[in-house]
């Protein structure tokens, strides 16, 4: 008799284990088995890459999977992303730095994958999931009708078959189902990587040892806990701390600029490459033997389909992988797993339709993945331009917080409407124009860095978007706020366009720079020959003042004016003083315990209301809206 389950998950990596936990939490009556070739204990540190999370994945791990306490106790907090630009052969402390000074109110984490996956296996087993270890999945035979699918397995020399109503491919880059069904899809993002783990704390702060107290103090928390990036044209090098005490180090390159063959064959070759391009990193690493050494050439790929109404899906790297720069891997796991659970739920309720599954594939593959690839594809040439990459990073974060993360936080991914698809397409089209603008800008403008340290938390628009992730909204409220955010991003795109024109085509700048023409942001480019045919000067939106958004990039493109110093820099400096410059140990304690470990909605309500405005909402605001036993004030976006 072949054992039969409601859900068979092939692969007990991060995607498979988190899916098993999510199914058990949301659909506890279902029987689940997880199959993996590796048996416990898995090695800590030297196990798998993919250690850093951003807000969407952190929400998934912490809130959806109910792992906040575990992550606080067994993993490390993440102090955002940090980038170092400029002359890699000069003094490290003189390199322009982009990174936050304090933890945000929404936690993110540095994950030791070996520790996490060991712990998750134990957790799901205790929840009633059957964890079948030391077992290889040979084939997946999909049923043509309502019969169970069959998974043919092998343990040692013994072969056996398992049956499941649902089967999930979480086998990683093996991509068993995608290969079987002809669903693999290249995406022409030619990038490669090599990485290793060192069994010691490697602190980038030690590279700036000659920077003195001022360099050390400008970041209140410990740089060590950031995902640290050393940036150069066509490459970046990462340093990520792990809870086991080890440090993950990696080299990632554009194949057309730094071929994999120049660094990826061995640890010795990688060290030689570091010595040539990032000597400060080489000095930090050279005395250690690695716990492991891994590499991937041309790591990026897509898929034609990852969900099916015939009761299968591909999650994690079994479906797609884009690029590690902004740690999107766990974000896609969160979205794919949540959609998979929704499909399973509807199936057992008799409500799953082929049309709904088509929408899920369209959402992830045609919109989210297609648009996210634009952050990385052909963009590695920008990394040598501190001011352009800083502008790009702020833009990327704004798009992510304004729409992508909100899709998940507001649970829209489970039931995307036509209006959601329409809005996503508008975001995607605008993002495509701006990303190409950055690429062309970097190709035409000289590299420069008007700043010593930039911190996106000084950008008020981004502050509002980040705080806004703490609000919970209805579907209509989500749509209205997403539209308002799109308006703000349209204004940012106009400012970026005119800055690029000023640097690359100064003869095209209007005489009066204080009143820039309002253009069609969906038609911007650095090719004047296309402006007429693309309708650059025929915007479909009414002119709005750009002044409120102008200070977003204060100090990034040029030293701050006196007005900006008073209006932007002075409040930021006072804010820093109140949170760390004067008494760093006390402020760190208060910040972590009063802000980071709590939703901090009291702080958010100082800036943002919780729902958008409509006539009915406006009337309700006067009296307050009662939700869940609490009275909350008002509505509106940013």
How would you name each of these model-derived features?
Residues 7-33:
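N-terminal Rossmann-like FAD-binding beta1-loop-alpha1 element of flavoenzymes
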Residues 10, 169, 314:
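Redox-cofactor binding/interface segments in oxidoreductases and associated redox assembly factors
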Residues 24-49:
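Glycine-rich FAD pyrophosphate-binding loop
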Residues 43-89:
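N-terminal FAD cofactor-binding segment of flavoenzymes
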Residues 233-235, 241-243, 255-379:
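FAD/FMN-dependent oxidoreductases across multiple families
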Residues 343-612, 617:
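C-terminal helical "tail/cap" subdomain of flavin- and related membrane-associated enzymes
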């Amino acid at each position: 008799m072949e054992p039969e389950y409601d859900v068979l998950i092939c692969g007990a990596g991060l995607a498979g284990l988190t899916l098993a936990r999510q199914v058990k939490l949301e659909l506890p009556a279902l029987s689940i088995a997880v199959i993996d070739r590796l048996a416990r204990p898995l090695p800590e540190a030297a196990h798998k890459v993919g250690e850093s999370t951003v807000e969407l994945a952190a929400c998934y791990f912490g809130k959806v999977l109910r792992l906040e306490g575990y992550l606080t106790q067994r993993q490390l907090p993440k102090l955002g992303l940090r980038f170092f630009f400029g002359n890699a052969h000069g003094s490290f402390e003189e390199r322009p730095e982009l990174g936050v000074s304090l933890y945000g109110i929404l936690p993110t984490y540095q994950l030791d994958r070996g520790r996490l996956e060991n712990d998750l296996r134990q957790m799901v087993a205790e929840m009633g999931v059957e964890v079948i270890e030391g077992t290889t999945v040979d084939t997946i035979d999909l049923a043509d009708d309502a019969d169970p699918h069959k998974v043919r397995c092998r343990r040692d020399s013994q072969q056996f078959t398992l049956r499941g109503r649902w089967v999930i491919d979480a086998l990683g880059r093996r991509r068993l189902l995608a290969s079987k069904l002809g669903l693999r899809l290249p995406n022409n993002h030619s990038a490669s990587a090599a990485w290793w783990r060192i069994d010691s704390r490697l602190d980038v702060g030690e590279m700036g040892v000659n920077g003195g107290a001022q360099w050390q103090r400008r970041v209140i928390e410990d740089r060590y806990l950031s995902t640290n990036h050393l940036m150069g044209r066509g490459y970046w090098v990462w340093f990520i701390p792990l809870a086991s005490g080890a440090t993950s180090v990696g080299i990632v390159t554009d194949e057309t600029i730094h071929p994999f063959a120049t660094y990826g064959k061995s640890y010795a070759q990688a060290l030689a490459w570091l010595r040539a391009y990032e000597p400060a990193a080489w000095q930090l690493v050279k005395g250690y033997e690695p716990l492991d050494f891994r590499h991937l050439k041309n790591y990026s790929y897509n898929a034609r389909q990852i969900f099916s109404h015939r009761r299968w899906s591909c999650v994690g790297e079994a479906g797609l992988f884009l690029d590690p720069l902004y740690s999107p891997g766990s974000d896609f796991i969160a979205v794919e797993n949540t959609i998979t659970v929704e499909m399973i739920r509807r199936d057992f309720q008799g409500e799953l339709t082929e049309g709904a599954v088509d929408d899920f594939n369209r959402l992830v593959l045609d919109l989210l993945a297609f648009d996210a690839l634009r952050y990385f594809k052909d963009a590695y040439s920008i990394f040598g331009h501190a001011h352009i990459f800083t502008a790009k990073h702020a833009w990327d974060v704004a798009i992510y917080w304004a729409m992508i993360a909100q899709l998940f936080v507001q649970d829209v991914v489970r039931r995307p409407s036509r209006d959601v698809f329409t809005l996503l397409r508008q975001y995607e089209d605008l993002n495509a124009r701006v990303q190409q603008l950055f690429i062309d800008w970097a190709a035409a403008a000289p590299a420069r860095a008007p700043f010593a340290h930039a911190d996106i938390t000084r950008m008020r628009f981004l502050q509002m978007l980040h705080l806004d992730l703490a609000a919970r909204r209805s579907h209509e409220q989500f749509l209205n706020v997403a539209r308002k955010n799109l308006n703000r991003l349209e204004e940012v795109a106009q400012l970026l366009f005119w800055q690029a024109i000023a640097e690359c085509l100064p003869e095209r700048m209007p005489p009066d720079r204080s009143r820039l023409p309002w253009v069609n942001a969906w038609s911007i480019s650095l090719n004047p020959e296309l402006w007429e045919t693309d309708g650059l000067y025929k915007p479909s939106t009414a002119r709005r003042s750009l002044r409120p958004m102008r200070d977003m990039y204060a100090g990034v493109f040029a030293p701050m004016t006196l007005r900006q110093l008073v209006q932007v820099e002075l409040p930021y400096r006072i804010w820093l003083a109140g949170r760390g410059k004067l008494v760093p140990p006390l402020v760190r304690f208060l910040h972590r315990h009063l802000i980071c470990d709590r939703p901090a909605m009291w702080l958010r309500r100082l800036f943002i209301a919780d729902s958008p405005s409509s006539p009915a909402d406006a009337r309700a605001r006067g009296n307050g809206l009662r939700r869940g036993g609490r009275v909350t004030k008002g509505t509106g976006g940013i």
